[in-house]
């Protein structure tokens, strides 16, 4: 997956660690969708 910004990472992608992973279909086991974006795209964070 592609790294994405979790809520716990901070308000901006600049200077922050991207601890989330962008998945196209849901989230892997042990992860949760941290943003309500599109139903087919999961902004997955631990």
UniProtKB/Swiss-Prot annotation:
GO CC annotation, single: extracellular region
Name of protein: Delta-actitoxin-Avd1d
Disulfide bond recorded as keyword: yes
Compartments, record wording: Secreted; Nematocyst
InterPro entries per the UniProt record, alphabetical: Anenome_toxin, Myo_ane_neurotoxin_sf
Function according to Swiss-Prot or TrEMBL: Binds specifically to voltage-gated sodium channels (Nav), thereby delaying their inactivation during signal transduction. Thus it strongly stimulates mammalian cardiac muscle contraction.
Pfam families: Toxin_4
Family of this protein: Belongs to the sea anemone sodium channel inhibitory toxin family. Type I subfamily.
One record GO biological process: regulation of signal transduction
Entry's Gene Ontology molecular function annotations: sodium channel regulator activity; toxin activity
Keywords assigned: Disulfide bond, Ion channel impairing toxin, Nematocyst, Neurotoxin, Secreted, Toxin, Voltage-gated sodium channel impairing toxin
Protein's UniProt keywords contain Secreted: yes
Disulfide bonds: 4-44, 6-34, 27-45
